[in-house]
Amino acid sequence: MMLFFTADLHFGDNETIERESRPFTDVSEFEETIVSNVNKVASSEDILYVLGDWINYNCINHPDLEACQKTFEISKRMNPKVVLVLGNNEERIVRDKYDGDFQKMRSDLISRGFEDVIKDGDIEINGEPIHLIHCPVDRKEGVINLFGHTHRWTGLWKPFGLNVGTDLNFFRPFSEKDIIYLLEHKRDWCDKDANCHCM
């Protein structure tokens, strides 16, 4: 079993494609590319952690519940088991579409193909504790955090962890091996160089 990580997919409409200048004609092309890129590297034995913002639901875009559910069902087309860490877009959906009931949303999404939906999580990679979170301000101190939320704007490295947003890996998921490599590189270079712009 291998673990994979991504964040900030914003499936569902073209707003993020346009705002972030993602190199896709429309959200359908983007969704197909993401599903294809995931399925090229991950099997049904693997787990894909999506660290928030699977769907685009914000002050501009308010799809109805049926449209949200259809967007969540994209998970059924992916080979690996998909675990969604709640992002700020999903938090809005919990509030607006599930009467503020996280467990109600979680149950619905599991019935639509997700392995699980969690608020945050803790795993180990290569024996190292790793905290999974959407928004980096909610990070856990004293461990490496994998996060999203900031898209490509804050870069890959932070002193407290790594940004696994899809925009930072050519719209492919980061593998467990990628994370091990990036953490070694972070410690050997970024953490030692005050001028590397990761602080």
Model-derived features: where do they sit?
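Core catalytic region of metal-dependent phosphoesterases/phosphodiesterases
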Residues: 6, 11, 15-118
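Conserved beta-sheet core of the metallophosphoesterase superfamily
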Residues: 102-197
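Extreme N-terminal starter segment of soluble prokaryotic enzymes
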Residues: 1-4
